[in-house]
């Protein structure tokens, strides 16, 4: 049976991704000085303006406008002709402390209040909600091929812009990859869509030629392309106005790009700007860690895990496994293995994945999972042997 599946990615200059990076840059700047800070930092941007808002409880000082401007400069919006200038844009901040009612449940979990005096039990989930983790063995990164290739294309777009290979490119851009599957195995790439912001002086013909040569052919394996593969490069014909000048941006509006490209389910909670007591982030990272190690251990070819939490309670209220018919054992038995091998209380996740460190800004563009260019704790295959003891 043949089917098509599509995923998209965006470059770091996309306005929503700008906001994710700004929020995580602020988070990292605070964690570098105060590893126990509570941060929920949201950013929005539009023409000539960045606004940072949220709840932050910390004993340190961070120059937020400076962090904002440095981040925007790194992305590449450093002159007016790009539609946004890091030095002249307005930066507004409106920050409050974390709600005392929320802090009460995070500082001391329900289990701890009931006498279970354990350092890990002391940290309650920062909110209710469900989080999903996913892994598949169809790529070496244990990621679905559509999102994996879309990210590679968007990263390459940024590389050729920053290294001067295609110096007429501007920071904003999007990629999309459609993969044809046969019998649930990726067979070929059916369609590639790339939209990239550019200077006024360059022709569409030049852009099409250069993108195929320096972006697509540089990162997409030739065996995945054939004479029937379709290419849509700047299909509107012009993309000069981009970034915050073209669209407003907001933290947390690219949650499918951040995860599995729609191939796996999503609980709805965004990642960027949140410290690790927020299970939206830490439990989603843990879920990926669990799923990847289970697939690498041979328990399934494709696996999704759902975790769910209650605010102020340490232990997950539920754990569910789905193997899509690829499992080598019943799913309830896999749940039992997960409970034996992994401690999924927020305090344990923070400890085991070392999530009090300022490591988050680097994840805020090009995906939080399957990052072969980074050494992220939740991507490590360090539980395989322990899992195999129970198979």
From Swiss-Prot:
Keywords recorded for this protein, A-Z: ATP-binding, Cytoplasm, Magnesium, Metal-binding, Nucleotide-binding, One-carbon metabolism, Potassium, Transferase
Localization annotation: Cytoplasm
PANTHER family documented for this protein: S-ADENOSYLMETHIONINE SYNTHETASE
SUPFAM superfamilies, A to Z: S-adenosylmethionine synthetase
Binding residues for L-methionine: 55, 98, 247, 278
Residues at which Mg(2+) binds: 16
Native source organism of the sequence: Clostridium botulinum (strain Alaska E43 / Type E3)
Principal location listed in the UniProt entry: cytoplasm
Protein's name in the database: S-adenosylmethionine synthase
GO molecular function, one term: magnesium ion binding
Entry-linked PROSITE patterns: ADOMET_SYNTHASE_1 (PS00376), ADOMET_SYNTHASE_2 (PS00377)
Description of how the protein assembles with itself and partners: Homotetramer; dimer of dimers.
Cofactor info, note text: Binds 2 divalent ions per subunit.
Binding site for K(+): 42
Cofactor(s), names only, from the UniProt record: Mg(2+); K(+)
Organism superkingdom: Bacteria
Biological process annotations from GO: one-carbon metabolic process; S-adenosylmethionine biosynthetic process
InterPro entries: ADOMET_SYNTHASE_CS, S-AdoMet_synt_C, S-AdoMet_synt_central, S-AdoMet_synt_N, S-AdoMet_synthetase, S-AdoMet_synthetase_sfam
Pathway assignment: Amino-acid biosynthesis; S-adenosyl-L-methionine biosynthesis; S-adenosyl-L-methionine from L-methionine: step 1/1
């Amino acid at each position: 049976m043949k089917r098509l599946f599509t995923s998209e990615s965006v470059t770091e200059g996309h306005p929503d991704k700008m906001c994710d990076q700004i929020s995580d840059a602020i988070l990292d700047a605070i964690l570098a000085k105060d590893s126990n800070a509570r941060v929920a930092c949201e950013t929005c941007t539009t023409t000539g303006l960045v606004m940072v808002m949220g709840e932050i409880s910390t004993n340190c000082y961070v120059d937020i406008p400076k962090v904002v401007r440095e981040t925007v400069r790194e992305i590449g919006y450093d002159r007016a002709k790009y539609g946004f200038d890091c030095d002249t844009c307005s930066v507004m901040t409106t920050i409050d402390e974390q709600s005392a009612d929320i802090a009460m449940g995070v500082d001391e979990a329900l289990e701890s209040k009931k006498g279970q005096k354990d350092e890990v039990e002391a940290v309650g989930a920062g909110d209710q909600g469900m989080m999903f983790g996913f892994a598949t063995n169809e790529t070496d990164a244990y990621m679905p091929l559509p999102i994996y290739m879309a990210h590679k294309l968007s990263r390459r777009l940024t590389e050729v812009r920053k290294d001067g290979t295609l110096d007429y490119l501007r920071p904003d851009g999007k990629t999309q990859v459609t993969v044809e599957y046969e019998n649930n195995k990726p067979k070929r790439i059916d369609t590639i869509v790339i939209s990239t912001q550019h200077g006024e002086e360059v022709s569409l013909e030049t852009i099409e030629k250069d993108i195929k040569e320096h972006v697509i052919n540089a990162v997409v394996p030739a065996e995945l392309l054939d004479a029937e593969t379709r290419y849509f490069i700047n299909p509107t014909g012009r993309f000069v106005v981009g970034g915050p000048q073209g669209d407003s941006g907001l933290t947390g509006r690219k949650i499918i790009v951040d995860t599995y490209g729609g191939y796996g389910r999503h609980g709805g909670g965004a990642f960027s700007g949140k410290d690790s007591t927020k299970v939206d982030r830490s439990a989603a990272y843990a879920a990926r860690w669990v799923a990847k190690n289970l697939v690498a251990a041979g328990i399934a070819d494709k696996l999704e895990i759902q975790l769910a939490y209650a605010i102020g309670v340490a232990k997950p209220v539920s754990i569910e496994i789905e193997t899509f018919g690829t499992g080598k054992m019943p799913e309830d038995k896999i749940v039992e293995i997960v409970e034996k091998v992994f401690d999924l209380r927020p305090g344990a996740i923070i400890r085991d994945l070392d999530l009090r460190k300022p490591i988050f800004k680097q994840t805020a563009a090009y995906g939080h999972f399957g990052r072969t260019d980074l050494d992220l704790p939740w991507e490590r295959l360090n539980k395989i042997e322990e899992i195999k003891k129970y198979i």
